[in-house]
């Protein structure tokens, strides 16, 4: 008696555990496939890591300092807070066509020279074998387009400085140091360091193509936020070349920054040179007006209060004039919504308000004092402006001649000694993981999609009795593997002679032992039947019904019973090949009335039983099986044999089994392990029952011992036995 634990969760938990065990079993069953695929991907990753071209990285560090401005802006720092250097515009400037274009022109990066290797693996193999790459120095090259497309020329190195240049429409010989011209192509080779026979591919791209290619491998980033430290990096397969390129970019950026600063100083100097004559003229006029007025008023002097007001007014006017000069320069650099520009406008507004206040104090003074104060203010203000402009002119002249910009190169370009790509260890690990993932995924996906019956319990869940589980015979499988791999159709394979007969050739095989267990079960199942005729059919083709029926006939014949095997598969029966007997006179000839029984019954001495083969394939198999001669044959056989086994076509393919089944006492249906689904078996049983056939149950044939089915359904077989694990 089995005791159940009432505290156990619902059956879903157990089913989940079974499914998990089944998946684990699937992985174990296909471990060779998983190991092979994983090893393959790992080897591919290793090969890729070894053969792929190493990519190196060079870097340089550039500092962008806060702009100090020119002399006109030198006094503005007290009005605005200190600001960090703006790196974003400088990063864009470094990656601009203006900077990169100069580098391309300096280093002739439009000219492309590549040594020709065997495709895919040639370059990597040459590197692994430490073969020194060839060198080709070009002093001048011009390759025009051909039909609107870029040309590629092949240069083959010859002996003693000679070479051959081959294009799409020409082949010409050349010499190192001599200019070669052909069909618009101009080439001067300065030096060749390569073995004779080495080939190089020459091409020339446009400046824009070269810039785009450079931008793909060149990056600029700020080392830390608002630090002004820009890190320039470049990747490539030539360490020396990327170092030269990076140094060229940094130097070109530095030179343009200095040139830009000098240009700003030059513009400011030109502005001051235009303003100085005008300011000097206005100062002379103001002094003359003051002198004339004093002469007219007998040298009127200002009192102490007026002098104090005059000093304040002159101070305010000087600041306003200074702001005017600053605004002229700032307007060239910033818009009015910029913080620097806004600070200047706010300062101007404050000074204007102060000047209005002072003007009110002046308006309260006597008229004579007011006029003297006004004229004196004009003189003092003009003199201050003039002196200020003179000082600024001198400062700008010095600044222009010694401009250094606000950029400096901190670290020149250096290429890291170790390549950044490929990352060999990472690639191997990723290859291993990818191979493992794909192989495991394929196994699990196949397991999920497979719907074939793999355990008797799957049939019993549909109310189908399982009389036997017959394991796959490894011995028979090895001997028929080559035949199954033949490209012929199933019918042609069945015509192949000398097919091994397992029950006789290897009677100790586990499949034969399982059929012996089936013999015992049938003995009790047929005790109450109306006759001793057994029909064996299948759900679909390739279920193994002929193997089961023929092996069963041999096993029963070995127990000293008289057995008749009838091949009723008039379409594709192949028992004559299995038994190596003649097929000239068979069941179809008897049913058609062409032959009598004594002519169609043959004895299979090797198996110890009689055989009626299918005969020649008739045009109307079903109609022949429905004739009275078939019923008469079965009645005669029932009287003259201890057991009659009828092998019929698959039930779902044709209805022949339903026709024959009405005349037999017992019927069994063969289902192939992993091939037939429970639904197919159930549907076949229903059709037989609807036709009035006494169908006893099913036989699960070709069972493969797998960890997945053992873990999932918990059965093991030896012969016919299987047991549930509680």
From Swiss-Prot:
The keyword Transcription regulation does not apply. It comes from Escherichia coli O157:H7. It is found in: Cell inner membrane. This is Tyrosine-protein kinase etk. The chain crosses the membrane at residues 33-53, 425-445. It catalyses: L-tyrosyl-[protein] + ATP = O-phospho-L-tyrosyl-[protein] + ADP + H(+). Residues 1-32, 446-726 are cytoplasmic. GO terms for molecular function: ATP binding; protein tyrosine kinase activity. The keyword Membrane applies. It is a multi-pass membrane protein. Autophosphorylated. Dephosphorylated by etp. Its main location: membrane. NCBIfam families: eps_fam (TIGR01007), PRK09841.1 (NF007350). GO terms for cellular component: plasma membrane. It is an enzyme of class 2 (transferase).
């Amino acid at each position: 008696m089995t005791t159940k634990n009432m505290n156990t969760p619902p059956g879903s938990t157990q089913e989940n555990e079974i499914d998990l065990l089944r998946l684990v079993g699937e992985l174990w069953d296909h471990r060779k496939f998983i190991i092979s695929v994983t090893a393959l991907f790992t080897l591919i990753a290793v090969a890729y890591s070894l053969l792929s071209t190493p990519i190196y990285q060079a870097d340089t560090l550039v500092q962008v300092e806060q702009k100090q401005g020119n002399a006109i802006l030198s006094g503005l720092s007290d009005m605005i807070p200190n600001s960090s250097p703006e790196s974003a515009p400088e990063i864009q400037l470094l990656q601009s066509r203006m900077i990169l274009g100069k580098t391309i022109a300096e280093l002739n990066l439009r000219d492309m020279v590549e040594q020709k290797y065997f495709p895919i693996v040639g370059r990597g193999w040459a590197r692994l074998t430490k073969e020194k790459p060839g060198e080709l120095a070009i002093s001048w090259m011009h390759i025009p387009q051909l039909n609107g497309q870029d040309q590629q020329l092949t240069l083959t190195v010859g002996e003693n400085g000679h070479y051959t240049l081959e294009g799409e429409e020409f082949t010409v010989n050349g010499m190192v140091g001599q200019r070669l011209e052909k069909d618009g192509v101009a080439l001067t080779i300065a030096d060749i360091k390569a073995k004779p026979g080495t080939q190089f591919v020459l091409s020339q791209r446009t400046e824009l193509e070269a810039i785009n290619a450079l931008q793909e491998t060149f990056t600029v980033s700020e080392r830390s936020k608002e630090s002004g430290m820009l890190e320039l990096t470049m990747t490539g397969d030539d360490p020396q070349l990327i170092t030269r390129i990076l140094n060229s970019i940094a130097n070109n950026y530095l030179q343009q920054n200095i040139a830009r600063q000098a240009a700003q100083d030059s513009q400011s100097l030109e502005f001051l040179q235009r303003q100085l004559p005008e300011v000097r003229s206005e100062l002379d006029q103001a002094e003359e007006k003051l002198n004339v007025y004093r002469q007219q008023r007998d040298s009127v002097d200002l009192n102490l209060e007026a002098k104090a007001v005059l000093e304040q007014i002159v101070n305010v006017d000087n600041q306003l004039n200074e702001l005017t000069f600053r605004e002229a320069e700032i307007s060239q650099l910033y818009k009015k919504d910029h913080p620097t520009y806004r600070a200047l406008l706010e300062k101007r507004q404050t000074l204007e308000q102060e000047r209005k206040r002072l003007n009110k104090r002046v308006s309260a003074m006597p008229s004579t004092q007011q006029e003297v104060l006004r004229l004196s203010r004009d003189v003092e203000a003009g003199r201050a402006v003039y002196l200020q402009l003179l000082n600024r002119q001198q400062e700008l002249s010095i600044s222009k001649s010694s401009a250094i910009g606000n950029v400096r190169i901190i670290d020149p370009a250096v290429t890291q000694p170790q390549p950044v790509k490929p990352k060999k260890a990472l690639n191997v690990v990723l290859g291993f993981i990818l191979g493992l993932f794909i192989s495991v995924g394929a196994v699990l996906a196949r397991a999920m999609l497979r719907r074939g019956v793999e355990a008797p319990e799957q049939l019993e869940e549909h109310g189908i009795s399982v009389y036997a589980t017959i394991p796959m015979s490894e011995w028979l499988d090895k001997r028929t593997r080559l035949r199954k791999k033949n490209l012929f159709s199933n019918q042609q394979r069945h015509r192949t002679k000398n097919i091994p007969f397992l029950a006789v050739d290897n009677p100790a095989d586990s499949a034969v032992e399982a059929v012996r267990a089936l013999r015992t079960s049938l003995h009790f199942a047929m005790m109450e039947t109306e006759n001793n005729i057994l029909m064996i059919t299948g759900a679909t083709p390739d279920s193994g019904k002929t193997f089961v029926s023929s092996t069963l006939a041999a096993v029963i014949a070995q127990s000293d019973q008289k057995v008749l095997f009838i091949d009723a598969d008039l379409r594709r029966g192949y028992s004559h090949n299995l038994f190596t007997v003649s097929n000239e006179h068979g069941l179809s000839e008897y049913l058609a009335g062409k032959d009598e029984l004594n002519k169609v019954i043959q004895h299979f001495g090797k198996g110890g039983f009689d055989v009626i083969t299918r005969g020649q394939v008739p045009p109307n198999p079903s109609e022949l099986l429905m004739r009275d001669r078939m019923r008469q044959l079965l009645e005669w056989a029932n009287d003259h044999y201890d057991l009659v086994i009828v092998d019929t076509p698959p039930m779902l393919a044709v209805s022949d089994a339903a026709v024959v089944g009405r005349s037999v006492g017992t019927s069994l249906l063969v289902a192939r392990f992993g091939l037939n689904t429970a639904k197919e078996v159930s549907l076949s049983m229903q059709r037989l029952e609807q036709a009035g056939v006494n169908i006893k149950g099913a036989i699960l044939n070709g069972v493969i011992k797998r960890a997945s089915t053992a873990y999932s359904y918990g059965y093991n077989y030896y012969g016919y036995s299987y047991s549930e694990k509680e």
